[in-house]
Amino acid sequence: VSSCKFSYSLFTPVLYPSKPKKNYLSGKPITAMIYRNRRAAYSNFILVFVAIKIALNLLSISNFGFHRDELLHLTLGDHLDWGYKEVPPFIAFLARMSLSIFGDSVFASRILTTVASGLIIWLTGMITRELGGKKFAIALACLSLILAPAFAASGYLFQPVVFDQLWWVLTVWLLIKYSNTTNISYLYAVGITVGVGMLTKYTMAFFAIALVIGILISKQRKLLFNKHALGAALLSLLIFAPNLVWQWRNNFPVAGHMNELRSTQLEHITAGDFIIQQLLVNGAALPVWITGFLFLLFSFKLRKFQFLAMGYVLIFLFLLQMNGKNYYLFGAYPMLFAAGGYAFDRILKTSRKPLKAAVIILFTVPNLLLLPLVMPVLPIRQTLAFFEFNNKNLPFLSFITKWEDQQQHATTQDYADMFGWQEMTALVAKAYNGLGAEHKPHTAIIADNYGQAGAIHILGARYNLPPVICLNSSFALWAPEQIAARYIIYVAEEFDDMKHLLPMVESYHSIGEVQHPFAREKGTGVYLLVNPKPALNELYKKDLEATRKK
């Protein structure tokens, strides 16, 4: 050993002899050749699990319709800017790309999220390998992640969530590579990733801060004691700067959005709910990530990466204090699954293959049975039967069907948000096409909420509907300054929501209501308002001004 020295390759630290033997046919060091072959073997092995995840997504992503949030995010793609009221701009750029390349079908809109999900699995396998795990560790970590309810539920919808998770996992992998190699290029890659991550979801900033503090209070603090750490931080801020400028120019609408979110949703989340849900969201894979967390915190073998466990604790406590939603923390679990795979690999190092296979089955197969609860792998009727069984026999999982109103429902809020949009848009088209050709140019469409407006924008294209007006969410940013129309097609969640408008119009006609039994929009009505009076336009301008000031 004394005659050897450490030499770092691009991918992992390897102990090379000072004068390695050579293969005399190729002239290359034998140890380097063995390492490259081994690296390729592990890469190919990880690709198996990437393929499993992608296949699972492709089999299920078109079973239900668009989610309410997906319709908003796709609409943002037609209104590109450096910021929006509820999200940073990255999802809008992806929407523009997706619509341009793949089209506007449900299946097409979820292709990029499926790719992101596959990359998360790839990086989880690579992190496991970097920690020192072999094939059993990789298999346990990747399968646990693929079938964990948290990641099955969040890994297929066109939302910032899955891309946020991707940047979290990529940041962790790059930090581990930097720790293993001290190659500063990885540090600058971290800076780029954090910058893009903050353009995806603002929670990236909190995770990055948690990791930095975790490093500073660990024995690895020397990793940040150089000018390149500051350079990486400045690079992140430079990438994120356009959104900061946009927020400043628009009076920081994200602050208003967060206040509204806290008052309408987050205030219902208790600390106890958050803790319990973190223990339940990964289902049977709980022992894997818990063991990984403990190994990162206390294991001598993983002492270099103790800062990851500290970072998890810090971001957990922050979200607990802020009444964060359970999925805000999902991006931190792949690193714990990777560490858990390594931990069980060490624990079962001398065990036979049947025992290792049994461990994988124990921590993954039960989650396979839970998939219909979080991912549309079955038709809706069979899925509802699963929910009924779940609520009767597994009451500790009843939070799955608890909506933001804190009431229990027949299905999850996410599933309910995927139904009724085609029906609603068809009613709007019925009202619009029922007007004479001479009246259509003088017709406006108004929707109560962003889901309705997004559906009319995306699904209404086939009916040649005019642009929809909505003062909810980011739609208010491009809403017209006034309504100059003789006819208004109004989409209201409830009739009571528009009763105050009736004295401001000459007459109105009810076109119909959404009847889908499982839709969150069930009961949403479509109305034709005829000859609005000036008072309606004045009310609209007042509401628009108030909305933009929030």
Model-derived features: where do they sit?
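Membrane-interface alpha helices of multi-pass inner-membrane proteins
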Residues: 79, 174, 186-201, 236, ...
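Short helix- or helix-capping micro-motifs
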Residues: 50, 141-146, 194, 198
